């Protein structure tokens, strides 16, 4: 089953697990609030100016997918916690998994395209292909967004087919969730259909993301070394700008890596579902998810300006 480790079968009664689930829900609320602010801030600018820069349009798309994804995941967490013995392919969880599969794939692709955009626009490479992409990439943005939605929809349908077939097999054979025959059929489908599909779906955008991030961080590192030779140190405004950009990129990369690892660990069954280690790992992942929107708010000049205007309006200053 896809989506926040939806294989069930044991109840969560441990007090530590309950505390971690509570922390997890709070972190998700923070992530929802942060992404919601990003959507609202850039959405207002879009309405006022009737346009958005390509980078901002990608940020809105990423923020919207994360906002919806966190909301769906929160619903799944509550459902799993309240119904730990529910069959993992019942209609409710299939509906939630359908949303999760689409939003998860869209989030991965939007994050990847944002890294591509940063790499092409910021990195200082002189290769002809790289320079050609600098001029063409912004015009491709609508097609990039549509292709991301299309790929996400296609893989979501493939996931739904596998999930629905297992549920139909369960109904035909009147199997119980803990039935040995039912579990063997489910394990076969998960191992030879869902798992390869997951790896292909998640690895493609991740590979592109890593390549772009390595190129971009390498370019910024070289530029910082050159700047150090011509400036008085790290207190120079230009150097501080490079450091902030590098830290923002590293935080983005850490979030993406941690999220990708959580997906792989889930698919491989490294952390048993509803086990204490499972909730610890989830808390770490969503701590990153909650922190990254905050980093974006302070690293993006437009978002930072909106945040300052909100503070000044609260204080009653012009």
From Swiss-Prot:
Localization, UniProt: Membrane
Topology versus the membrane: Multi-pass membrane protein
Cytoplasmic compartment residues: 29-40, 110-128, 205-234, 286-318
Extracellular side: 1-7, 62-88, 150-183, 256-264
Chief subcellular location: membrane
Domain of life of the source: Eukaryota
Glycosylation sites: 179
GO cellular component, one term: membrane
InterPro entries referenced in this protein's UniProt entry, alphabetically: TAS2R
The entry's keywords: G-protein coupled receptor, Glycoprotein, Membrane, Receptor, Sensory transduction, Taste, Transducer, Transmembrane, Transmembrane helix
Ion transport listed as a keyword: no
UniProt GO MF annotations: bitter taste receptor activity; G protein-coupled receptor activity
TM segment ranges: 8-28, 41-61, 89-109, 129-149, 184-204, 235-255, 265-285
Alphabetized PANTHER family for the sequence: TASTE RECEPTOR TYPE 2, TASTE RECEPTOR TYPE 2 MEMBER 60
Family of the protein in this entry: Belongs to the G-protein coupled receptor T2R family.
Further details from the record: Most taste cells may be activated by a limited number of bitter compounds; individual taste cells can discriminate among bitter stimuli.
Function field: Receptor that may play a role in the perception of bitterness and is gustducin-linked. May play a role in sensing the chemical composition of the gastrointestinal content. The activity of this receptor may stimulate alpha gustducin, mediate PLC-beta-2 activation and lead to the gating of TRPM5.
Name under which the protein is recorded: Taste receptor type 2 member 60
Organism this protein belongs to: Gorilla gorilla gorilla (Western lowland gorilla)
Taxonomic placement: Eukaryota, Metazoa, Chordata, Craniata, Vertebrata
Gene symbol of the encoding locus: TAS2R60
